[in-house]
Amino acid sequence: VPIGSFQAVKHMLADVKVALEYARSHVYRAANSVARATEGRAVDVSMAKLAACEAANRASRVSLQVHGAIGYTYEQDVHIWMKRAWSLEAAFGNSVFHNQRLASGVIDRTIPAQSFGYISAEA
């Protein structure tokens, strides 16, 4: 029986694909803003880090659930991807740091409006 014949599995994998594509766009934007040394590069990097961590964690959780009990064993490589997702969360500042960085920038109005895709009211 093909795995795609199970609708619940299809939905879980579709959610993972959406999260990965969302993260990919943020990572590309962050890489571009760092390469060009734009003013909002710190914001773009924080948004990319948060999106990538969320996508990696979601993908590893769904993978574990889709594989079932065999996903908990060392016979499959699911445990490796879980550990990589967890280590990504801890590397280069955790989610708390990046959320606080974004929140303080929004509250202090130090983040350029263009970072969120909006045209500044002052422009």
Language-model regions, residue ranges each:
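Alpha-helical interface subdomain recognition
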Residues: 1-123
